[in-house]
Amino acid sequence: MKAIIVLLMVVTSNADRICTGITSSNSPHVVKTATQGEVNVTGVIPLTTTPTKSHFANLKGTKTRGKLCPNCLNCTDLDVALARPMCVGTTPSAKASILHEVRPVTSGCFPIMHDRTKIRQLPNLLRGYENIRLSTQNVINAERAPGGPYRLGTSGSCPNVTSRDGFFATMAWAVPRDNKTATNPLTVEVPYICTKGEDQITVWGFHSDSKTQMKNLYGDSNPQKFTSSANGVTTHYVSQIGGFPNQTEDGGLPQSGRIVVDYMVQKPGKTGTIVYQRGVLLPQKVWCASGRSKVIKGSLPLIGEADCLHEKYGGLNKSKPYYTGEHAKAIGNCPIWVKTPLKLANGTKYRPPAKLLKER
């Protein structure tokens, strides 16, 4: 049997031959790399967002405190901190707190000389604790304190629940009953009465007025000296006599005098002392505070929930791991601030289409 051999001859024509390579569409994405500088890539994932200002919110999964006492209507946080009548109520616990009051912080009842002490800081001090409660008992018997007996002064601008004249529950205005004479400095010890190992915040102060009023109330029109000491911190004051313009608080009667209010922090089991002369505001109910609450500057009301609270932008939900814009304090599950936008390259390095090569 004969084999038939077919010879095939491949002839190359003069037609062009096309060589292909890696191709991709033109890419608008540029990323900066550590080794090659700016590089075009076929795809990127944005890692940053630029927030816009929004309402502050409750922090997701965390109790957030706005006002110290949400149910105390028409009360500033300083009213609550000093336990002004009609401003005493439940102070809920919180892991995060909004510092929402701006200067000047005022309180009713009686004109306060805010700038003489650190009293403006008291609401923020309380806000920094997770749990705060006002004691049910008084820390000392003010009527029988050294230099007494005293009657407890009240203010017509400070009505209580029965619409009678009242005063702050944290202090007793000690006015001598029948011994209206000058006195040398007297000392009262302030015991620790909190029951759960909390910090005890004890509020106290003194009253100053015109010479005539000081003489009528206390039997002494000279400047009076006061000192508080607790937890290794000692503070001294000398009262100012006269020079106060009449001032009205919350539609009450015009007041010719002023009160200076301060506080001291007593650690568990530690006794504080107050050295005083006439016009003292002796401590009564105290704040018992424990735990820590993160504090951030913000505004009320708190609307909805957010992953993060940011001082400049309010409530943020974390849609990207980083953000650009204004850098400020933030708490919660927050994106990280970066100066310029970040991108993650999720494609390949861009290569231009291969050129057509001709062979003759």
Swiss-Prot record:
Glycan-modified residues: N40, N74, N160, N179, N246, N317, N346
Keyword tRNA-binding in annotation: no
InterPro entries: Capsid_hemagglutn, Hemagglutn_HA1_a/b_dom_sf, Hemagglutn_influenz_A/B
Gene3D superfamilies noted in UniProt: 3.90.209.20, Hemagglutinin Chain A, Domain 2
Domain of life of the native organism: Viruses
UniProt entry keywords in alphabetical sequence: Disulfide bond, Fusion of virus membrane with host endosomal membrane, Fusion of virus membrane with host membrane, Glycoprotein, Hemagglutinin, Host cell membrane, Host membrane, Host-virus interaction, Lipoprotein, Membrane, Palmitate, Signal, Transmembrane, Viral attachment to host cell, Viral envelope protein, Viral penetration into host cytoplasm, Virion, Virus entry into host cell
Subcellular location as annotated: Virion membrane; Host apical cell membrane
GO MF terms, alphabetically ordered: host cell surface receptor binding
Modification after translation: In natural infection, inactive HA is matured into HA1 and HA2 outside the cell by one or more trypsin-like, arginine-specific endoprotease secreted by the bronchial epithelial cells. One identified protease that may be involved in this process is secreted in lungs by club cells.
Membrane topology: Single-pass type I membrane protein
Family from the record: Belongs to the influenza viruses hemagglutinin family.
More about this protein: Major glycoprotein, comprises over 80% of the envelope proteins present in virus particle. The extent of infection into host organism is determined by HA. Influenza viruses bud from the apical surface of polarized epithelial cells (e.g. bronchial epithelial cells) into lumen of lungs and are therefore usually pneumotropic. The reason is that HA is cleaved by tryptase clara which is restricted to lungs. However, HAs of H5 and H7 pantropic avian viruses subtypes can be cleaved by furin and subtilisin-type enzymes, allowing the virus to grow in other organs than lungs.
Subunit field text: Homotrimer of disulfide-linked HA1-HA2.
Name of the protein: Hemagglutinin
Species assigned in the record: Influenza B virus (strain B/Hong Kong/22/1989)
